[in-house]
């Protein structure tokens, strides 16, 4: 009876708890049903309002025509000066000014591969206009000012800055997005009403103020404009004074913006689980046509109007929009870049300056009361603040930044709930006090529920145990004695040292205790073994160090000291003679060594080749600051040899490839040469071989690093002339480095070719071998193309060792092993052309689509389809691209034969497509991409997820389609404004 009553009470308690939890969920759901929305302003001047819970678009508008928030003439001027790639454009002189678009107004000057922060913000330049500044020096980040009456010797370098600020106002209905009233930048209201806007707008209205800061750089002598730059920002305001909420907000969700292409940005909103109780989906996403600049949370019911932080995800190749040279080449391979760049139709801007990378969001949250109160003051009195002097601006700059802006912090996907690297969250959209009560109530209920279940199970177990071991109508004393008898039974695993607590535990407790004791004993044994092993290792290290320190040094009279351990000490270098890293021509040997405690590679060369060593040292000094060129540390010499201390590398590229071939490492470890028994291309028809080369990201990165290293040498007018697998090294961080520039030569400014013969044959082009003295930078392009093919296949494109030179002179090569990889096949094919003028330069190699991300390739195909759509079907362009239909369809001549039936049933439903037209195939890709969300689940499953799965579907069906389209646009429309972003 006792157990029955207890069980009934527990069941009743569980019933109450379950009802209570449902009430909590309903309460939270009711609280979440509000008008919370996200206000997003984009770089093209648009404003969007999304419902925070559902992700539905409430409205979008273009105030004042939707002019872009950023424009500059700097990059147009540079494109006129150079027709090279975008990387080369930014390198050319003079320097350029790059703004940040986070509202801080910070400006950075890019000059000679360096970024310097300008000591004046954009607002300060406008407020102090006119301003006379000297151009920044190459190695300095400071600028000096002068008045109009000053004159100096560097008068030609002085630039006059004229600035102005224009403000416009747009009053919007926050529910519908309808523009109620607006004021232009000239101060004119664009409605017929004469009332003050505060008197005519409803309570639910929002007022967007747009401030545009423009600076114009002029030549003070001639008055000619050098360039101009304009940056604007939208700031929303509410007409309700109580929107300055004093509640500290803690947004634990994630707002992430991913750059898909120049015209496509995906905004991803992930909401925290506790704010969406009972809802299966806690995230949503949208594609925007321009980069988001600011995001605000707005709710009229909760009186929220707060600027939110969001994380940006930029492709690694997007960071190469502007090269920033490293000042320390010994950095780890997984370092994070300080700056994140993006561009708007070729105009660079910074989305994440270093000042925002380490900010702590807790400061923003903890000081929210004061900051919120200061927000409207700063915004409403912006014009008054602009009239302050320069000193006041400098003193108040940090405070205003903190009050108006939440910092952009890099997103770490390894941390839960989108927390940033500082373990801090963004601003919350819920009342933290209410949320705290929800948590306490919910968590306490769960704890009670779990505790009740445990009590119920243990009570039932004890009750059954008593029934088995007692007769009916036994009294409490008998029950107690019986329980003691059961507990006094010993188990085989019971240990004696727990005897004193034996009577207070049942058999199950004893088993658990034994397992814990056995586990602890095993852990103690492992710890003892580790301590013992560690002591032995430390003892061996101490003995080795004592042996080195106490060794008797023998001086052989030539500046060389032989240590007792057999190592050779010469100058600052210690050479480990029994560790040979490699050998070279002319008696060259590379040893492992040490220099001032740093592990280095020591290259020993015969003194008679000192001329080559001096040339190599000179080139290494010039290329000292690049991660993909071997770094020079020191040079020592004795009577016989010259010793060069260079970056320590574990192996050469030749050793790497040979080890991969001999070991046949698994696909996860072997990045370049692998077998594939399943080509996974369906009816593709192009990859039918069982053994095919597979290229993963590691191999692609190695090839890119090779190109980057050569790009650095060529930027210094250095021609290597001896690029081969033996002269490409791999360091402990798996970075590729170009070495052995002993045969290189530094070209003079007016000298574009050189005449010098090398003993390394088989990797040089025909013009080098036949002695025509046309050895320009294209020599290195040819050699690098051969090295890339060797990295991928382990073979040489011009055949076996003894036939290579003959085949090179004939222009006879075979690269069919990578024919199933059209991108890299076309790149290598162009690099090893017989005629030097047909080979690309190193900038074109780096910008080749082989290195493009999937989303960029997909964007390119869509752009090509957009352009060809406006051409007549019989136009020369459409006729030319359609002539490649046999190549694209692998000889079938009709792309309909390769499309899956589920797509065929849908494609022909709306319009007719010609299976013999490449233009129509591109149209299919464009339409399916633009209407992907409208496709049926079967079609989405067939095509795969955007963008990777979608692109791979068509790439596997038509592996030649992309490269054919790329070469077609390259030939006919390369300089068209529609495609210039892809080629420069």
Swiss-Prot record:
Extracellular side stretches: 27-436
Main location: membrane
Subcellular location, record wording: Membrane
Residues covered by the KEN domain: 854-984
GO MF, any single term: protein serine kinase activity
Keywords: ATP-binding, Coiled coil, Glycoprotein, Kinase, Membrane, Nucleotide-binding, Serine/threonine-protein kinase, Signal, Transferase, Transmembrane, Transmembrane helix
Skewed-composition ranges (Polar residues): 667-676
Biased composition (Basic residues): 490-503
Protein name: Probable serine/threonine-protein kinase ireA
Coiled-coil residue spans: 467-533
Comp. bias regions, Low complexity: 82-91, 141-150, 356-397, 472-489, 677-691
Record's bilayer topology term: Single-pass type I membrane protein
